[in-house]
Amino acid sequence: LERTGTVVGQLSGIGTVGAIAGTVLTGFVLVSRIPVTAILLGLGVLLVLAALPFAWSARRHPGALATVGVLAAGGLAVPWLPGGCDVETAYHCALLEEDPEREGGRLLVLDGLRHSYVDVDDPEHLEFAYVRAAAAAIDAAYAGDGALDAYFLGGGGLTLPRWLAETRPGTSSTVSEIDPGVVQIDQEELPLPDGADVEVRVEDARLGLGRMATDSVDLVVGDAFGGVSVPWHLTTEEALAEVDRALRPGGTYVVNLIDHGEMAFVRAEVRTLQQVFEHVVALGEPGTGARRVAGSSDPR
């Protein structure tokens, strides 16, 4: 009894260290390097192996052994059953669907959410209303069809970069996309128009933004999402100051946001943009959660 407290404390400490190590290894090593299906299969195999001693002890009960065998066989067959992903990337379950109503239409679905629609035969076709609104904001800021230097926070299917390349010949676009699996899908399944000057960098957009040269672009488009949320580190005043630094005088920042209800997040982000840009405008359709916010030092 005199050592009970010490023993319990040691066991608790060992358990805590194990829990922390397991969480770190799973979150930063396993999930980022090994497909989830492989992780689940590996865990299943380990559980089956751990159960073998108990199965051996229960060998006098054929019914129990048969049940265990059926369950184990069924579990091992699961990874080969049809799933919901074409590609399991480090960040997403990615699915590319063909549009039965448009021959060149492709829908990029990430984790069950529609992220990008691309018509590989017609880069000027913008299927989603929020993308059309962002394009309208760009055209309002830059009349005509003059070439632009643009930077994109987030890539997805590269819908707007290919639209700019088609509607404003000579436009140069740089894209920061964090998921190499999505970039691979773009390269293999969603080819860019011939002659499109689009450079895609596999990197966190916040880090990529910091690498952009001062006064180097006319347009910055924020289109990065984790699910339905904009990554928080792209919404701060510090990040927006970096956007302003990269923009040439009179340049424009257009960001896509999703919010509902009282639009507390959109209101907060508008206030944040107002700390950096002299002129800020918010656009959106009633009854939807999609909003576009544009900021610039130029009132146009």
Where in the sequence are the language-model features?
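Loop-to-transmembrane helix entry/capping segments in MFS-fold secondary transporters
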Residues: 2-11
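Glycine/proline-centered helix-kink
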Residues: 14, 19-27
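Residue-level recognition of pore/gate-forming positions within transmembrane alpha-helices
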Residues: 19, 44-48
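Structural signal for membrane-spanning alpha-helices in multi-pass inner-membrane proteins
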Residues: 26, 51-55
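A membrane-interface helix-boundary motif in multi-pass transporters
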Residues: 30-45
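Basic, ligand-binding patches in group-transfer machinery
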Residues: 54-112
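The AdoMet/dcAdoMet-binding core of the Class I SAM-like
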Residues: 125, 132-254, 261-264, 276
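Class I S-adenosyl-L-methionine
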Residues: 264, 270-300
